[in-house]
Structure formats: structure tokens, C-alpha cells
Curated annotation (Swiss-Prot):
The gene is acd. Its EC number is 3.13.1.4. Homotrimer or homotetramer. The lineage of its organism: Bacteria, Pseudomonadati, Pseudomonadota, Betaproteobacteria, Burkholderiales. Its cofactor is FAD. This is 3-sulfinopropanoyl-CoA desulfinase. Keywords: FAD, Flavoprotein, Hydrolase, Plasmid. Disulfide bonds: none annotated.
């Protein structure tokens, strides 16, 4: 059983106040306009909720992942878009750079996030999704620079992010050295060799653009190489470690969305009258509400446990278990909450249909529930999944 310290309870209340006062009132408009909420991001920054995990010596707060998931849930409960932005501003790319980067790289990344940037982690490609190690974006060594060519797909924050962590297959004198990561900071308008392609309009969490990115002879200095060559044992494994934290964050966004939907459904059940009494008095709905509360609390326990596991990053199996359960719980709870609303919840005037759409992505993005189940099985069986083959091989 987890428990929050007094300091964490204060942090939770601070996050809740900001989310409910500033982000909840604009959530519907963000969904409709599909515009990046710059003003809300500014508030997130000024209130100290960006760069929370960055060490104090680089200007951050040095907070734990446990602290961070407490904040993420509150943000996501008010607005799914702000929940995701909170994840990206504290986990994922920034975590990889702060753990594996040089001093110069850490300073660059910290400065970007602490000025309000949401870093973009660039890994997925049109033909390399779950099988990420099959990526074809390449970086050819030329003197003191690498020349990047290729295409990335479903890049969260494409077009609004300045700091990019780009994963590519490195070639030195034509020899494949494995997968590495590079920092690229986009200043002003996108240069010709870093092309922001078409936006991929999504079903939910619509306030953050998902885009194609194309690299056309993009030059990156060798000093911006974050994860050195080494194939699956070094570069790629390091990337997956950074993803553990991001998966816990994504699962927490799903939890926040579901918790918000659940609370709205409970209020509605108490107020809605049918057959001369509140529908909350009917046993069928009581059982639905009871089951939802059990599932939500179980998801929260798993997420908090995962956030506290591991060393630099959460444990891979714990992160996978937590994300699977939280994401599937969110899909069920939002659908059951809509069911309690009936036809009213199905209408676009009601936030419930938005909650259902927002929750749907989390069994897919950041690792599908099926791939993550394979990771969990691998940890139990002491085996791993080589993504290039799609089957198990001994370690």
C-alpha cells in the first residue's frame, strides 16, 4: 500500500487547484480547436510543473517519478492534453538526456524544458512501430558531423517542440554501428533539412499535434550524440529504459482521464431522477460504480509502485504491468461512465464522449498492450523479445 507524505499531499493539492481552475475550463475548447494550449503551458511552467525531474544543479527540482505521477493524474483529470504535456515535460526524452547525456547536452535540454518547451522523442517510423529496432532513418558520419536522412511518424509535439531527441541507425564509413540518439534543437522556423510534415489528426487528446518529421541531410554535430553506438545492448536498450518512465506517465494520464469521468458519473447518478428516485439507488448502477472504484484504485496502486521501482528509471516489467492495467481500466471506466449518463453522455455537448475518445489511445501509444504483455512474460520467463525477429531468444 502506498502512502503520500505531507509534502506530496501539498504538491497534489497545488496541482489540483491549478488543473481545476485553469485547465478544466479550457479542455473542451482545446478538444474542438485542436490547437496547442500555449497559455496553459505557460501556467504549467510558472507554477513549477515542467522540468520537475531535472536535477537541481541544472535548474530543476530534482523530484522523483512518484512525485511526478501525483501531478500528472491531477492534470489529466482536468484535461487530457495537459496531462500528456506534463508527461513529456518531465519524462521520456528529457529523462534520457539527463541520465545519458554529457554536461553540455544536459544544460541544453534543461534550458529548453525550463523555458517552456515540450521535448519530442523521435523514434516511430511508417514501417517501424512496435518493431522499433527496424528503423531505417540513418546518420552517416562525415568529419565532425552526422548527416541524418529519413522519416519519423506519429511524433508527439511535431511542429511545436524545439528540442528533439532523434533516434537513427549510425553508419561510419558505410558500416552499420547500431542505433543511437541525437539532440537537435529547432530554432525559429523549421529549416529545410528538418521538415515538419502533415499533421495526423487523432481521435482524442487533440491539443498536441502528432506529425510526420522528415530529415533531408540534416547536419548534427558529433557533440550532440547522446546514446553511443552499440545496437540492442547499448543505444537501443538505453532508449527502452527511458521509455519505462514515459509508460508510467502515459498510464497515469489514462488513470486521470478515467478518474475524472468516474467522478462526473457519480455526481450525475446522484442527481439524475428516474422512476421517482435518483438512479444511484438502483443496485445495477451501484455495482458498476463499485467495480469502477476498485479498478481505479488498483490501477493507482500499480502506477505508484512502478514509479517507485528501479533506479534511474522504473523497472521495465513494473512499468509495463502498470501501463497495461491503467490503460485498459481507463477504457472500461470511461465507457461505463458514459453508460451511466445514457444518451446524454453520447452527445457532443457532454464531456463524457471526449473522455472515451481520450482514453482510447493509451492501449496503443507508447507500447501496445500486446507488446507490453510480451515484455512482462519475458521478465517472468527470463527471456527477451528481439523486435527484429518477432519471437523469443534466450538472453
Amino acid at each position: 500500500m502506498y502512502s503520500l507524505t505531507n509534502a506530496q499531499k501539498d504538491l497534489q493539492l497545488k496541482a489540483r487547484d491549478l488543473a481545476q481552475c485553469a485547465f478544466a475550463p479550457t479542455a473542451a475548447n482545446t478538444d474542438v480547436t485542436e490547437a496547442y494550449p500555449w497559455a496553459n503551458v505557460d501556467r504549467l511552467l510558472t507554477e513549477g510543473f515542467m522540468g520537475m525531474t531535472i536535477p537541481k544543479e541544472y535548474g530543476g527540482q530534482g523530484r522523483s517519478y512518484h512525485d511526478t505521477v501525483i501531478v500528472i493524474e491531477e492534470m489529466a483529470k482536468a484535461c487530457a492534453t495537459m496531462g500528456r504535456i506534463t508527461v513529456e515535460a518531465n519524462m521520456g526524452a528529457i529523462g534520457a538526456i539527463m541520465n545519458y547525456g554529457t554536461e553540455e547536452q544536459k544544460k541544453i535540454a534543461a534550458a529548453a524544458v525550463l523555458s517552456g518547451d515540450k521535448p519530442a522523442i523521435c523514434i516511430s517510423e511508417p514501417n517501424a512501430g512496435s518493431a522499433a529496432s527496424e528503423m531505417t532513418t540513418r546518420a552517416d558520419r562525415k568529419g565532425d558531423r552526422y548527416i541524418l536522412n529519413g522519416e519519423k511518424y506519429w511524433i508527439t509535439g511535431g511542429g511545436v517542440s524545439r528540442l528533439h531527441l532523434i533516434f537513427a541507425r549510425v553508419f561510419d564509413d558505410g558500416v552499420d554501428q547500431g542505433i543511437c540518439a541525437f539532440i537537435c534543437v529547432r530554432e525559429g522556423n523549421s529549416p529545410e533539412n528538418l521538415v515538419v510534415g502533415r499533421r495526423l489528426y487523432a481521435m482524442g487528446v487533440r491539443g498536441i499535434p502528432e506529425t510526420h518529421l522528415e530529415f533531408r541531410d540534416l547536419q548534427v554535430h558529433k557533440s550532440m550524440l547522446v546514446v553511443p553506438p552499440g545496437g540492442l545492448k547499448r543505444g537501443f536498450a538505453s532508449l527502452m529504459n527511458a521509455y519505462n518512465a514515459q509508460r508510467v506517465g502515459a498510464g497515469t494520464v489514462a488513470l486521470g482521464i478515467a478518474q475524472g469521468a468516474f467522478e462526473e458519473a457519480v455526481t450525475y447518478a446522484k442527481e439524475r431522477q428516474q422512476f421517482g428516485r435518483p438512479i444511484a439507488e438502483f443496485q445495477g448502477l451501484q455495482w458498476m460504480i463499485s467495480d469502477m472504484s476498485i479498478q481505479l484504485e488498483a490501477a493507482r496502486l500499480l502506477l505508484h509502485a512502478a514509479a517507485c521501482s528501479g533506479e534511474s528509471f522504473p523497472d521495465i516489467a513494473m512499468a509495463a504491468r502498470a501501463k497495461i492495467f491503467a490503460a485498459e481500466t481507463a477504457n472500461k471506466v470511461t465507457n461505463d461512465s458514459l453508460q451511466i449518463y445514457g444518451s446524454s453522455g453520447y452527445g457532443r455537448h457532454n464531456p463524457m464522449e471526449r473522455h472515451v475518445r481520450d482514453a482510447r489511445m493509451f492501449t496503443i501509444a507508447g507500447g501496445t498492450a500486446q507488446i507490453l504483455r510480451t515484455q512482462v512474460a519475458g521478465s517472468i520467463l527470463d527471456m527477451k523479445l528481439p523486435q527484429t525477429r518477432g519471437g523469443f531468444l534466450p538472453k
